[in-house]
């Protein structure tokens, strides 16, 4: 079991089998949970319901199971809908109104918008780079230099860019639904996959592991 984050870094989970009680964490099943945001999914749902009066968009959790399955191609949507700190929307209005909507979320609601491949996540400010840094910090606090820290990041959307720039090794995964991610021009150790996820993840890690002489425990 390894630590992980969800909802674009809004919430972190650390397995109790590896980590002792972590500051500011809550007990959640077999994990210590840390929330990096200050509004939960229910609060965001209520905010978005009010904003629907002025803008044209759909809140994903309001759609039928059939429509969500068609949009996502997922076999099981339970985990996708089990959100703690955010809501997903599909924008159906024009660009001008989207700019106005974005201002209201950011300024009036103190929130952020993370554009994924097909959906937009609405939450309190968070991103995967912040989550990655926090996980690294907690590793260091818990184990000091026991574990070798060389961060590898894989991503295929704009909301992965900050995390990819932060990592020592960045794997940009091909994505037909999104424009190519542009990383910092001085960024080193960047690998671009030829395949899309999930095979692009495997392709990237296999080639990176070869470059690192088998240091990745696959």
Give the location of each predicted region.
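Short, well-ordered alpha-helix to beta-strand connector turns
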Residues: 1, 85, 167-168
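Mg2+-dependent phosphoryl-transfer enzymes with acidic/Ser/Thr/Gly-rich catalytic loops
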Residues: 106, 119-218
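Generic alpha-helical structural signal
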Residues: 42-45, 49, 99, 133, ...
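Structural signal for conserved beta-strand scaffold positions within catalytic alpha/beta enzyme cores
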Residues: 5-6, 14, 59, 70, ...
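Conserved acidic, metal-coordinating active-site core of Asp-based
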Residues: 51-152, 158
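Short, surface-exposed amphipathic charged segments that create phosphate/polyanion-binding patches used
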Residues: 18-23, 72-75, 207-211
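Short, basic, helix/turn surface patches
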Residues: 8-18, 84-89, 105-108, 142-145, ...
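Active-site phosphate-binding/coordination module
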Residues: 1-61, 175
